[in-house]
Amino acid sequence: MSQDPILTSKGSQEEEDFFGLDNFFPEPESPLPPPFSFASYDIPANIDFYVPDHRKSLILRLVGSHPLWGHHLWNTARTLSTYLLETPQITQSRHVLELGAGAGLPSIVCVLAGSSKVIVTDYSDEGLLDNLRFNVDVNLEGEEKERIAVDGHVWGQSVDPLLGHLPKGQKYDLLILSDLVFNHSQHDALIKTVEATLTSSSTQSYDPSNPSAPLTEPSILVFFTHHRPHLAHADMAFFPRLAESGNGWAYEKVVEEWAGAMFENDPGDKKVRGTVHGWRAWRVRDGEERGEKPSRISL
């Protein structure tokens, strides 16, 4: 991942003047280059909700550089955000927690799509968290801003501060994990946080003739790209490890979409590096076997 993101005509990471950002975010008088860059997410034409200044895009500020890769708006976050907008039943009136959020695009989208409470988190680094707050302020106003909060969290550590954002005794209905499973050494810590923050499954019983859990079932969305194709198997190891945790988990594929390679000259098959995979996982219900379920999509 040594090369700058590709600039495309569809908003992957456009030149700032394309969006009029020179006027929106005035250049500092200092001769030094600004520590931030900007990217945008174009709202699908069939989705209608209000964005400040009647913009058709969400504007995301990215940290100038960071070892946790928060200085890019990943194609995975774009694809996941579109999925959330096109699958409203999974987000509306829900308590949502995003882990390792980077620029926070999916969380902002959840607020606009009607989630009742959204907590957007990243590693407890003040630069990352301040940048998340900036993106919330730029893209949300009024009552919408009251439904989102920014917090720091180290995977596997105490979740009490995260649960403290909700009414006593409640947990989250939806967890968002966008481009996190590449961090193979942290799978166990990530699963520990997932287990501790997702609410228990609903009372809906398992139907063998329809093995997929309803979209309203408490679940986690795990979207990612195999940025290092030779380690794809290690990315995928997250799912069987999740399935064996706690009382067991089931999972199904919900998205497979070509989004383009983030870094043109990186090693490995370009098609693999440019394809976003989206999975949904839930705790097994009574009588349900853990593990992979039939995909919801036609591959």
UniProtKB/Swiss-Prot annotation:
Subcellular location per the Swiss-Prot or TrEMBL entry: Cytoplasm
Alphabetized SUPFAM superfamilies for the sequence: S-adenosyl-L-methionine-dependent methyltransferases
HAMAP family (alphabetical): Methyltr_EFM7
Natural source organism: Cryptococcus neoformans var. neoformans serotype D (strain B-3501A)
Pfam families, A to Z: Methyltransf_16
Highest rank taxon of the organism: Eukaryota
BP GO annotations: methylation
GO CC annotations on file: cytoplasm
Keywords: Cytoplasm, Methyltransferase, S-adenosyl-L-methionine, Transferase
Name of the molecule in the record: Protein N-terminal and lysine N-methyltransferase EFM7
Enzyme Commission number(s): 2.1.1.-
